């Protein structure tokens, strides 16, 4: 081999070895670069440590201070991303729970009218309240003037008298028919049965209405229980005409809610009109206010939805249903000649409004205290929260304006009494339901454990409802059996004297606070206005009272010494009557000369 060939061979070996070394170096560099890329995509500190170990195996020369800083920053960013993912998952769970609750509420509102109503509570409270009835002898002593007049009405009709003619009647004809039937059969015990049925159907109708209104069976049951509590304290002893109208008023509210949900047809408004007629035949003035407001609310709804033809057709259907029942019942007053008197007397609450200084201040203070302590004012204010359905807006409109109108009428009526607030129940109870529903949703959003409605009703009002209820029940008992016990005994003595010194055809008149004396003595009244403390607001009624006494010439007139005698009445007593010697300090007995 020549020298040139040897040099070429050496050069080839060196180039080959250099090329081999270059390939090995390239492999090492590629391995280190791949390890670094894996580190950059890592999200956990543990993974970065593993990559670090792998890179150390490949070669410690690849590691630098810059890669360590990069690993630290990537670890922190991965931790932040994990926190964001966890927060989003929690928010998603809350949204899913809220959607589930809304779906449950929608399904409940859709099928509310088809579910059975729990009957244990309405049956128990209806029987309990029905047994505390003024038709029973012991409870009769606690009856108010209005209750005694209504009891007299039923008894007088069983004696052949007619309402609006022989006695002044502010209630509907159907109510007086129920009172007469109760007096004819079973010695007024049947009145207790009628009252129990009225309580029961009013409570069940209220439950259905509230359940459809707020889509909550829990609130429906609580408002139903509140209804029985208010009925017990405001209408202690029962026998008020409002009780018999409540099933129809609550039923009409439920009908409106069902219609707005698309569950009622236009033709079904005939049944709505029939219910309105039955309510009108119980309490005319209250029913007029309710159905007038309902008509305005439905009209506004039809105008907004551009359903003018539907609204007109529904009005005709409702008018037909009303007329089918009204004409046969109203014909009774035409037949006995009292139709004109019936219209005049049943609207007494609207005609007798007097806003003078005589009784206005006393009524204003008394009824404002009841509004505040029983929670009606709170329910009115809290019901103005945002509502979500057209049914809630409709019922809130009717209830708010109805509550205001009834309060104005009650304040302007001369006759004062807690029983006047019974007319607030068809308007106040839906507002209570809206109030409770709003508070319950607030509790659910804030996840508050103590979400009891009774805690809200009593505690938020400083337990004033408890004090008001205790007063309304306790005062009549204390007044009758402690403060005026001698008065009741003396009245019974005079009633026995009248019964034994007069014939069954003789009439009497009681210038007293109640109409107890007539039934106790078994004698009819000489005037359609049974007492001087009721229905004498208009001047014409005061004039009619004196004229009827002069014309009928009652054999006995009993005067309560605690009541002022008008000059016209005193003149009649002086000219035509003489005193009868009777022991007692509360009454004076006069006999016709």
Annotated model-derived regions:
Residues 235-245:
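Short acidic/glycine- and proline-prone juxtamembrane loop motifs at membrane-interface regions
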Residues 206-231:
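Transmembrane-helix signature of polytopic, membrane-embedded enzymes
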Residues 267-288, 404-410:
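Membrane-interface alpha helices of multi-pass inner-membrane proteins
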Residues 413-456:
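Hydrophobic/aromatic-rich transmembrane helices and adjacent perimembrane loops
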Residues 193-215, 251:
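Transmembrane-helix motifs of polytopic, lipid-linked glycan transferases
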Residues 290-320:
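Perimembrane helix-loop-helix junctions
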Residues 482-536, 545-566, 585:
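Short periplasmic/luminal acceptor-recognition loop of GT-C membrane glycosyltransferases, typified by
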Residues 214, 252-271, 377-391, 436:
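Membrane-interface transmembrane helices that cradle and orient dolichyl/undecaprenyl
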